[in-house]
Amino acid sequence: MWIADGWKDYEVIDCSDGEKLERWGKYILLRPDPQVLWSTPKKNPNWNKLNGHYHRSNKGGGEWEFFNLPKQWTINYRDLTFNLKPFSFKHTGLFPEQAANWDWFSKIIKESGRKDVKVLNLFAYTGGATCAVAKAGAAVTHVDASKGMVTWAKENAVSSGLADAPIRWIVDDCVKFVEREIRRGNKYDAIIMDPPSYGRGPKGEIWKIEEKIHPFIQLCSKLLSDTPLFFLVNSYTTGLAPAVLTYMISTEVKARYGGHVVSDEIGLPVSDTGLVLPCGAAGRWQE
């Protein structure tokens, strides 16, 4: 398992009864987590010192309850700064476990010694990976179907000192954007994708990951340059086991470029227990 253990401003303090107790900077949040199937004693005093609690609804969704929590605040990861704003579907605007991937590809970019690395970040959300890529010295194209998410990602770039970095911001359906890039003959040295389990594009395009992910990996592999550095696929869908990611990336990327594919779970350390909370999986190819 790849563990995002480099955080200072974030931690999973404890988890029990379908919820995880987290510290985001100086604020304590309690959010539902479908992986937390256990019921363990809640001994940490922070269980009773919440600044925000997302309550699930029996009808689906839910709502936030706030206790002296600002509408927006920031946390840092290494030399990156992220703007947090709790919003619908329990989210804060950041997936801290992805830091395990940021560290991995940042090292690859820096060690390549290349000054002209071009990276494509698809389903790019609020730009955690985009900022990490840019900070590592590469040019990045950030694509997300949500205008609001792209605006938020720009704010994160500015906060991280990347206002003048070579970042191209695109609001578009990711599949259609990739198809157009293929027609234009554009190439990238690395591709990152973080597809949702289910989603809709700006014109109502429906995305179901089990149906779409393999053809999409196939499509994206056509955008790789002659000397690609890495290819990363993230998954939060329990049906997409690491071995499934390895198989798909191997048939489409490794078959063409050689290199190595490794897939595994991604997790966050739990401070009170010393155990690890699983947070999905990732498949990684590198030359």
Give the residues covered by each predicted segment:
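A short glycine-rich, Lys/Arg-flanked "PGG" loop and its adjoining helix->strand segment in the class I
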Residues: 211-227
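Conserved alpha-helix/loop element of class I SAM-dependent methyltransferases that forms part
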Residues: 96-114
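C-terminal catalytic and target-recognition region of SAM-dependent MTase-like enzymes
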Residues: 228-287
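S-adenosyl-L-methionine
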Residues: 146-192
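Non-catalytic substrate-recognition/targeting regions of SAM-dependent transferases
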Residues: 6-22, 29-96, 103
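Conserved SAM-binding loop of SAM-dependent methyltransferases across substrates and taxa
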Residues: 126-138
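Conserved class I S-adenosyl-L-methionine
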Residues: 115-125
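Conserved SAM-binding motif I beta-strand of class I
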Residues: 139-144
